Curated annotation (Swiss-Prot):
This is L-lactate dehydrogenase B chain. Its EC number is 1.1.1.27. Belongs to the LDH/MDH superfamily. LDH family. It is a peripheral membrane protein. Substrate binds at residues 107, 139, 170, 249. The lineage of its organism: Eukaryota, Metazoa, Chordata, Craniata, Vertebrata. HAMAP family: Lactate_dehydrog. Pathway: Fermentation; pyruvate fermentation to lactate; (S)-lactate from pyruvate: step 1/1. Interconverts simultaneously and stereospecifically pyruvate and lactate with concomitant interconversion of NADH and NAD(+). It comes from Monodelphis domestica (Gray short-tailed opossum). One of its GO terms (biological process) is lactate metabolic process.
Length: 334
């Protein structure tokens, strides 16, 4: 007796399970992980999306909730499991998992606890997707990108930290508000460590090729009557402000990560400020990851732009590198 499906559909080719071309995995289904997932789906970047987490009920619930929206996406397959076999064959793996900082906990202790989490996660990712590119989003992102690179054994062009892609987006938004011009037409770079010791490259800030520092030589200094330095201060403080107001940040970082993935999967060779291994650049001597303008394409992070930085900007970068190395050098089990 023929089934309804057999009566409805007349096959022309034999049914075979086709391997996905653009499979993306998100590790961790917290606020940030799910913002990454919805941003990836919204841009139709994946033909299969896999979610992984240790919290099985939440994981299943998030998967079902997304599957119920399948009519509104162009992603035919959404899967989830706590077993990493579900991630097999991923082109890109986004890592958002990690432990949160406890009150009064030192940064070193927080990082060490995350190292212990990553020691389980990273080998599993590489086991099932040996050719993937890993994007690390968990904080402190620059140190955890270094940890991922060490644990994965992958070449450095395939281990990327989300880094200052979001910091730069915040900077361009705030700049656009001040000038009344769309952020995409306001050009400026935040480099170095994601967060408190990031570096605003004032010498490169421009609109339509017009250097704003040439129009206002005091821009970014304490002597600036227009107080542009406040814009960078707001970039640093904005995450804390959002966390204070709603408990976490997620939408902007999710959109930022989807932006990076789009550049790679579509082989666009766009330039993004993301965290990469900077040893040997700008006089930095240790194996630390910091954000510099990097070219991303289908192979991963293929090149770094040699941006002309002023002496004080280089000094700030080196200071960031030293701060990170002070923590990294004491990490155990890497």
């Amino acid at each position: 007796m023929a089934t309804l499906k057999e009566k409805l559909i007349a096959p022309v080719a034999e049914e075979e399970a086709a391997a996905p071309n653009n499979k993306i995995t998100v590790v961790g289904v917290g606020q940030v992980g799910m913002a990454c997932a919805i941003s990836i789906l919204g841009k139709s970047l994946a033909d299969e999306l896999a979610l992984v987490d240790v919290l099985e009920d939440k994981l299943k619930g998030e998967m079902m909730d997304l599957q119920h929206g399948s009519l509104f996406f162009q992603t035919p397959k959404i899967v989830a499991d706590k077993d990493y076999s579900v991630t097999a064959g991923s082109k890109i793996v986004v890592v958002t998992a990690g432990v949160r900082q406890q009150e009064g906990e030192s940064r070193l202790n927080l990082v060490q606890r995350n190292v212990n989490v990553f020691k389980f996660i990273i080998p599993q990712i590489v086991k099932y997707s040996p050719d993937c590119t890993i994007i690390v989003v968990s904080n402190p992102v620059d140190i955890l990108t270094y940890v991922t690179w060490k644990l994965s054994g992958l070449p450095k062009h395939r281990v990327i930290g989300s880094g200052c892609n979001l910091d730069s987006a915040r900077f361009r938004y705030l700049m656009s508000e001040k000038l009344g011009i769309h952020p995409s037409s306001c050009h400026g770079w935040i480099l170095g460590e994601h967060g408190d010791s990031s570096v605003a490259v004032w010498s490169g800030v421009n609109v339509a090729g017009v250097s704003l520092q040439e129009l206002n030589p005091e821009m970014g200094t304490d002597n600036d009557s227009e107080n542009w330095k406040e814009v960078h201060k707001l970039v640093i403080e904005s995450a804390y402000e959002v966390i204070k107001l709603k408990g976490y940040t997620n939408w902007a970082i999710g959109l930022s990560v989807a932006d990076l993935i789009e550049t790679m999967l579509k082989n666009l060779s766009r330039i993004h400020p993301v965290s990469t291994m900077v040893k040997g650049m700008y006089g930095i001597e240790n194996e630390v990851f910091l954000s510099l303008p990097c070219i991303l394409n289908a192979r991963g992070l293929t090149s770094v732009i040699n941006q002309k930085l002023k002496d004080d900007e280089v000094a700030q970068l080196k200071k960031s590198a030293d701060t990170l190395w002070d923590i990294q050098k004491d990490l155990k089990d890497l």
